[in-house]
Regions:
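N-terminal hydrophobic/helix-forming segments and targeting peptides
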Residues: 1-220
């Protein structure tokens, strides 16, 4: 018991209102279940919904692509929308092995500051994307992201990590002979719940940062 107790799968049950016989005609073992939570607009340029980790990252990438559409970039850009990031980064492992990139950017979410949270460990909603700084990341790529943000006057925040990033970047960086990797993350509240909250301006500025980096496609 207690607030910190995490229920195991064997402790969970879903009351469907059906009898066992009726339910067996509808579902089978292994069927997935999710919360029927719509995307809800909020005040102050924010939205609430499920799976914004990492739908917001996909939105930022698509926005970045729209910004550079039709432009002649100084590099070849591949986009990977991978699965199972939360269960071992399996999609990222296969994708990076197949693409064999020279440089990889992982776009994800990170913890946004809320009531009672440590401001040292969290980003500020509305403060722009967070650029990862970690010993597992390429400092050259990190510096190039910072330079792109500063050149285009895009607000950004540092996300300092002492080890692994907890993102697909951890897989990218050790693919084959190693890949120079960076992270760009969107501040998000209530992570891994059906009511995650993001600020739209952070998503747009993440896309703007990615586009600015693509126009340079270089490391410092």
């Amino acid at each position: 018991g207690g607030e910190e107790h995490v229920l195991s799968v064997t402790e969970l049950a879903i009351d469907t209102g059906y009898t066992k016989a009726e339910l067996e005609q509808i579902v089978t073992q292994g069927d997935t279940v999710s919360f029927a939570m719509p995307l809800l607009p909020m005040e102050n340029d924010r939205v609430c919904g499920r799976s914004l980790d990492d739908r917001s990252g996909i939105a930022a990438i698509l926005y970045a692509l729209s910004l550079v559409q039709g432009e002649e970039l100084p590099c070849s850009c591949s986009v990977l929308f991978s699965t199972q990031e939360e269960t071992g980064e399996r999609g990222a492992t296969i994708g990076a092995f197949t693409i064999e990139p020279d440089i990889a950017l992982a776009v994800d979410v990170t913890f946004a500051l809320g009531h009672g949270d440590d401001p040292v460990k969290c980003g500020k909603m509305g403060g722009g994307p967070m650029i990862g700084i970690s010993p597992t990341l390429s400092r050259d790529v990190t510096n190039a992201l910072i330079a792109a943000a500063d050149a285009e006057q895009i607000p950004w925040q540092p996300e300092v990590m002492s080890g692994m990033t907890g993102t697909n970047a951890d897989r990218f960086s050790v693919t084959k002979g190693g890949v120079r990797t960076g992270t760009v993350s969107i501040p998000l509240r209530y992570m891994h719940t059906p009511a995650e909250v993001i600020q739209i301006s952070d998503v747009k500025q993440t896309g703007e940062l990615l586009a600015a980096y693509l126009r340079r496609c270089s490391v410092c």
